[in-house]
A protein has these predicted regions:
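Cytoplasmic-side transmembrane-helix entry/capping segments in multi-pass membrane proteins
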Residues: 50, 69-80, 103-106
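Membrane-interface helix caps and helix-loop-helix hairpins in membrane proteins
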Residues: 38-43, 65-68, 91-101
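Aromatic-anchored segments of alpha-helical transmembrane domains
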Residues: 28-33, 80-90, 148-152
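Structural signature of hydrophobic alpha-helical transmembrane segments
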Residues: 40-53, 76
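Membrane-helix exit/interface motif
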Residues: 84-96, 120, 124-125
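Short, Lys/Arg-rich, polar N-terminal cytosolic tail immediately upstream
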Residues: 1-16
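Membrane-interface helix-boundary motifs at transmembrane edges
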Residues: 61-73, 128-134
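Alpha-helical transmembrane segments that form the membrane-embedded catalytic/substrate-binding core
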Residues: 106-114, 142, 146-188, 214-234
Length: 234
């Protein structure tokens, strides 16, 4: 006798075959990388693999528990984005080797999250148990706000990971000029400008960079700005 859940699962796979194939292939790749990382005692890479597997599960979790039916194309884009960000970006060092990889991903993230937020609001407005409706303009605003909120929460996550696990998810930026109140010799609450910075010395050792090392602020603000652009484009 065929189990009813197996029959239902088979129908879902047949209905969403492109999504299932994409999910299965990417998940297999990540699991293999995870196993290799554990054998090599590379626990930071293993952390990124586990994070990727968790993020892969989010679209299915939202569909199952909240009734949010995502278009197949959008779901494939989400899976591809997660793989590109964590596996290609972090483990394969695309953030360092491919110019603007981080900027491109955060722009796409803004677009995808706005689309996801729009689907969520649309489903809520169609729910007969909820007595509210939104005009298209307010739905667009809600989708935009949802996208920006996800962008901010992701930056919180990156900051927390850097502080707790010693990662460097908030990438560094080399600057040649800074403005600082702390470095004002008079102690007044006015910024002093330091320009044409060419070297940075830490504990008497010169760092191999041609300027001052910003450890995440510029990267975070740039990420939020391009997330904003992606959300507005949607």
């Amino acid at each position: 006798m065929r189990h009813p859940k197996f029959g239902e699962l088979k129908k879902q796979i047949k209905k969403n075959k492109p999504v299932f194939i994409t999910y299965a292939v990417l998940r297999l790749i990540v699991v293999l990388i995870l196993i290799r990382s554990l054998f090599r005692a590379d626990y930071q890479s293993a952390f990124y693999c586990v994070l990727t597997l968790i993020l892969f599960f989010i679209p299915a979790f939202m569909e199952k528990n909240f009734g949010i039916v995502l278009p197949n194309t959008l779901e494939i884009f989400i899976l591809g984005f997660v793989f590109a960000a964590e596996i290609l970006g972090e483990l394969n060092c695309y953030y360092l080797t491919i110019p603007h990889w981080d900027t491109m991903l955060h722009t796409i993230n803004g677009f995808l999250c706005a689309a996801f937020g729009f689907c969520l609001v649309d489903i809520l407005t169609r729910n007969k148990n909820l007595k509210f409706s939104l005009s298209p303009i307010y739905m667009a605003i809600a989708a935009f706000c949802f996208s920006m909120t996800i962008g901010v929460l992701w930056e919180f996550f990156e900051f927390s990971a850097d502080c707790i696990f010693g990662t460097d998810m908030q990438k560094d930026t080399v600057l040649t000029a800074i403005n600082s109140v702390t470095l004002n010799p008079s102690g007044e609450n006015s910024a002093v400008s330091i320009k044409n910075i060419t070297t940075t010395v830490v504990n008497g050792e010169r760092l191999p960079i041609d300027g001052y090392l910003d450890i995440g602020l510029f990267d975070t603000m740039k990420d939020l700005m391009v997330n904003f652009v992606g959300a507005v484009v949607f």
